[in-house]
Amino acid sequence: MHLTADQVAALKASWPEVSAGDGGAQLGLEMFTKYFHENPQMMFIFGYSGRTEALKHSSKLQHHGKVIIDQIGKAVAEMDNAKQMAGTLHALGVRHKGFGDIRAEFFPALGMCLLDAMEEKVPGLNRTLWAAAYREISDACIAGLQS
């Protein structure tokens, strides 16, 4: 599924609210905290340990979350050029091959946690639209990961 021009415009219009404040660092941290709470076995794969509550104070995890939110912001900025966006995200997926046992099946659950965190931050967020955007973003990353 490719997003329409109107959908891309809506995503771009809502991005400033999604990333407001600290540029998405807290949003990324909330995403990962939810993900690890629901999938504690994934902490080791992502290089973290300890209690999920303690991770809320991890500068390393906050940085990792911000990097992901920054990348989503770049993808949103490039969405009106699907080929460019796909190329950028494909390269990101290729880079993730070197980070250990990162697999395509990790992306859907992480996406659900991202959407939950986004909805908490921005009440009234168009979750259906953002879910479609996340699928496009993650599909391009996965293509690189599996190449």
Swiss-Prot record:
Keyword Heme: yes
Gene3D superfamilies: Globins
Sites where the protein binds heme b: 96
One function term, GO molecular function aspect: oxygen binding
Entry keywords, A to Z: Heme, Iron, Metal-binding, Oxygen transport, Transport
Every Globin domain range: 2-146
Similarity field: Belongs to the globin family.
Any further remark recorded for this protein: This protein is one of at least six components in the polymeric fraction of Glycera hemoglobin.
Subunit structure: Polymer.
Protein name: Globin, major polymeric component P1
Organism: Glycera dibranchiata
